[in-house]
Amino acid sequence: MFLCYHTGKRQSRRLELEDKRQRILSIDALRGFDMMWIAGVDRFLMRAGAAMNNDFGAAMAAQMQHVDWAGLHIIDLVFPTFVFLAGASWPFSLASQRAKGFADRQIFWRIVKRFLILFALGLVYHRFLRFDFSHCLYNSVLARVGFGWAVAAATLLFCKRLKTVVWISVGIFAAYWLAGLLIPLAVNPAGVDPWAPREVAVGRIVDNWLMNGLSQVFGEGVMEMRRQNVFAALGCISSAFLGMYAGLILKREGWTPARKSGMLAAFALALGLGGVVAMLTGCPCVKPSWNPTYILVAGSIATMLLSLFHWLIDVKGRVAWSFPFRVIGMNSITVYLLYRFVDLEKTGRFFFEGTANFFPKPWAETVTAAGAAALAWLAMYWLYRKKIFIRV
């Protein structure tokens, strides 16, 4: 991870222009829109839904909570969209690094370094520094983002032909699908649905295998595997590949911005159709196991959103509305870690409790939640104004 701090108007303007040439504003805007949901907006909508005390409010609040197994809520799309956008940014980053003279070996080690940093940040996020290693979540969100992105990034780096990249990504997805289908059928009693609840799903089976193996080597209690879901990390590879293909569409030379938006929309529809076909074959959309249908459906929605953002920003030239999202998107890792390391809810109550007391009690909590979300955005805005971007 490195910290960029730009000072001086002339230098800042030059670096800003260079950065815009290397970045796609629609990707930054969509990344900010994605992270917004876990940067306080989810808590605000949950409190507002409870305060409404009606069916609409209950439905709105439910969308901010993860489904227990099969199904899909808005909040369930945040993680795969983040992985998708990491993949979408890579074609531009790769071209930029090669233009600066980096050899493929150097770029590969930068990929490895980024994965290791994300893995380490994930450990810190999940209280690794308490030194309670047996209960630490090793397969964290950041670790899975880094792993999925690293595999897709290295594939594009070393494969000279795009056709080879496509075949590798299709092979990985097919193998993942077959493993999710066949391993439960081989291990569980006959007649068990392989996509059924987590007790018989492939993620739990693989976790149990790992836990038993580690226990034999290191002794009982070496690691609590209930929440690791190691197998699902492999699914993140496919999500990153989908984002990478979207990025390649945006980077395609000779296509107009309008055509790129149209191709993204067509890609999204194809993925959505694939998700429908998968569901018709008996594979439900299951976020906790990151199963094939979930990969296709979440990828379809992320691609369609990118098509919409690209059409509005890069085709129609309507950029101003995206500024609040770009402020977050330029420091996405920072805002993700912020809520873990800073108690913004307590800070929100400190600054806004007096204002909240003018409202009935259910709405008072909504006001403080809105204040906490506003503080998070203001912190990102301060970093944006100071040209401080913490990137990995």
Residue ranges and their predicted role:
Residues 1-392:
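Alpha-helical transmembrane segments and their immediate juxtamembrane cytosolic regions
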